[in-house]
Amino acid sequence: TAAIIPAFNEAESLPNVISEIKGLFPDHLIIVVDDGSTDGTADIAKEFGCVCLSMPFNLGIGGALRLGFRYCMDRGIDCAYQFDADGQHDPTQISSLLSELEHSDMAVGSRFATDCSYEVGQSRKAAMNFLRFLVRIYTGQRFTDTSSGFRAFRNPVIKLFAKEYPVEYMDSVEALLIASKNGFKISEIPVKMRERSAGQPSNRNFRLIYYFL
């Protein structure tokens, strides 16, 4: 089992993220994909004994994830999970996400699967609702969180994404479309998010909609 952590200038938050995963899952392979960072993110990953894959420049989360999937495919990794480097994902929920792979090919940790305390602004909420609507049209499946960065994958999906994972801004949404188109079963489980430990959040959902349209 491997953790794929795309990281761009996350030197401040990465040490705690790695330490938490190692503490809970000492047998998991941790792969940090340094996406052209300039703050020493790669050095920290190496210091903590992680596999560090370095991009020559910033390609975005999609490009970083594809590299991580290729690494897993080449080494025959059975299952992998995507985990953010900013500290917002709770590693105690990794087991639940991986357990979902017992009857699914891909599992998504949803912030909105049940009534929860995770709040977003009205404009961002509207963007998320629109993305959910578009994905439902294309897949016929109702997803509550199309932009979640907390996901798990079985080996067949890893192999698919190693070759076809989208590298543009809409990677999280398009990944759902690609997996669904290829007949893979995708499921969601509710997860809780934590406050970002460092850095600044992005307007990712608005860029996703712009690219999609």
Residue locations for each model-derived region?
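Acceptor/aglycone-binding surface of glycosyltransferases and processive sugar-polymer synthases
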Residues: 51, 55-57, 61-74, 79, ...
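Cell-envelope/extracellular polymer assembly enzymes that use nucleotide-activated donors
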Residues: 1-2, 29, 174
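Catalytic donor-sugar/metal-binding loop of nucleotide-sugar-dependent glycosyltransferases
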Residues: 142, 164-167, 176-194
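Short, well-formed alpha-helical segments that are part of the catalytic scaffolds
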Residues: 9-23
